[in-house]
Amino acid sequence: MMNKKIKRTLCGLVASLCLGGSTVPVFAETVDFDVTVPGDILSPRAAKFDSEQRFYVTGTLFNKTGRLDCRSINRTNSAIQSRIASISPSYLSSSALYYSNAPSGQTYYMTTSASVSYLRVKGRYTP
């Protein structure tokens, strides 16, 4: 009787470890950006490894007050784009949905425009 209980407990433990140990969390790559509008308006490229249909942008440094409008675009198929996410010194983080399915395993970049000239923003971008 005791042997049967131990076997059952061990089988349950092994099954739990197999299920829990085989799951791997999947994330999109996060890159730092430094853009100036007009001028250098593109972020570095970043790989998207998840299936979430939203991109994220966070500003960490603004050289002056203004709004930065950001859009995420698929590098190989520019028809795959996001809506605009806006950040400013008052609203440092934002996100926006993609208009169509943004597949994982591909590379994306962020393009920007601004409400004022010569706005320089540093921050992080996750496709």
Predicted regions located by residue number:
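Mature secreted bioactive peptide module from preproproteins
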Residues: 29-127
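N-terminal prepro-regions of secreted/extracellular proteins
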Residues: 1-48
